[in-house]
């Protein structure tokens, strides 16, 4: 694993686990890390780690509509730093009713599925391969070690960071 990838996982992992442990309803840290990696291209300097649309900055993005990818310009939320982006991501998911099914799951595959198959049919992402991409990142980098609240792992965040 590259130094850049290790740093990314440790940085997002610590922040995600802090948010996960502090909230009553939250998404698994492994899913948070994988989404940040996919949406930002493993870039901690990205203004929008999670690709959440909203007021912030305009960028070109690919969306999948009517059976094919199209390039569109859209506006994304921007955050001043990585910590604020992670808090913003957890706030967004917690406050958006369509993602309620993705919160407090102990299984990352079910969690990712519920981000796409939402209660109102508006998925987190339009990419038909989004679920498999997120699951692949989680499994390739063993990101479930960050989900210790659910799996009973009593290791500290620092111990987990050392395992990456």
Protein language model regions, located:
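Catalytic cores of secreted/periplasmic lytic hydrolases that degrade extracellular macromolecules
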Residues: 1-163
């Amino acid at each position: 694993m590259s130094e850049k990838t290790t740093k990314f996982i440790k940085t997002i992992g610590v922040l995600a686990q802090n948010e996960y442990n502090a909230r009553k309803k939250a998404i698994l840290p492994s899913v948070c890390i994988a989404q940040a990696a996919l949406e930002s291209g493993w870039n901690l300097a990205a203004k929008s780690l999670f690709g959440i649309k909203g007021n912030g900055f305009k960028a070109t993005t690919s969306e999948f509509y009517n059976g094919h990818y199209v390039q569109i310009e859209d506006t994304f939320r921007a955050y001043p730093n990585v910590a604020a982006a992670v808090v913003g991501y957890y706030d967004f998911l917690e406050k958006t009713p369509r993602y309620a099914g993705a919160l407090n799951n102990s299984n990352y595959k079910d969690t990712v599925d519920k981000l796409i198959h939402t209660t109102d049919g508006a998925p987190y992402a339009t990419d038909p391969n989004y679920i498999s991409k997120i699951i692949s990142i989680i499994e390739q980098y063993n990101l479930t070690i960050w989900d210790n609240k659910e799996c009973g792992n009593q290791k500290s965040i620092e111990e987990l960071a050392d395992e990456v």
